[in-house]
């Protein structure tokens, strides 16, 4: 569906492989939504590094850019980040974690927003289906709390430790959040 390579008259840009594609949804009619991430070899984004969301229309045989989010992260870091979370909700919203930020991207209209910043990948977990995520808040009044989100409803809940305790995020079992309570000094 997509390539930076030219069939004829290729040049040095054809041999730069610091990008990849992640398919995020395939519909029954053959339409495909995918994310291109890393270094952009050609086109209007040539020379930039980032994440680009595309929609391929099978009926029209056309690839349309929906949104581009530039990044200073290298291809290797983007690849690792996008392996952590890339979930499409029933409302056609794509949720991505990269560059320590949780993004919501509306695939239909191409808008994007940052839902949360300062998320450490090591303190972030995603459920089996990708519909839920949780992370430990790093800064501010809520530092040390666990925040959980449901990507279908955007409902969140916050778990706070009692005095003299801290929380450890263990991950998910299916769609259920698993965390531990540690008594300070243990």
Segments from the language model and where they lie:
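Short beta-strand elements that form the blades of beta-propeller/WD-repeat-like
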Residues: 1, 22-55, 83-98, 130-140, ...
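Long amphipathic alpha-helical scaffold regions
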Residues: 119-182
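Surface-exposed loop/turn elements that mediate protein-protein interactions on large endomembrane-trafficking
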Residues: 1-17, 43-78, 97-117, 141-163, ...
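Repeated scaffold domains used in trafficking and secretory/extracellular systems
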Residues: 11-26, 71-87, 117-129, 163-176
């Amino acid at each position: 569906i997509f390539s930076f390579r030219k069939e004829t008259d290729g040049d040095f840009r054809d041999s730069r492989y610091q990008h990849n594609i992640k398919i995020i949804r395939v519909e029954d009619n053959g339409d495909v939504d995918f994310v291109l991430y890393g270094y952009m070899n050609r086109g209007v984004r040539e020379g930039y590094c980032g994440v680009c969301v595309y929609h391929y229309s099978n009926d029209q045989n056309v690839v349309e850019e929906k949104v581009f989010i530039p990044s200073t992260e290298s291809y290797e870091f983007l690849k690792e980040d996008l392996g952590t979370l890339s979930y499409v909700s029933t409302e056609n919203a794509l949720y991505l974690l990269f560059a320590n930020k949780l993004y919501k991207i509306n695939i239909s209209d191409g808008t994007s927003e940052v839902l949360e910043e300062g998320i450490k990948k090591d303190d972030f977990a995603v459920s089996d289906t990708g519909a839920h995520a949780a992370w430990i808040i790093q800064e501010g009044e809520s530092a040390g709390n666990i925040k959980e989100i449901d990507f279908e409803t955007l409902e969140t809940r916050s778990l706070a430790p009692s005095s003299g305790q801290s929380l450890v995020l263990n991950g998910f079992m299916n769609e259920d959040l698993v965390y531990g309570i540690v008594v300070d000094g243990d």
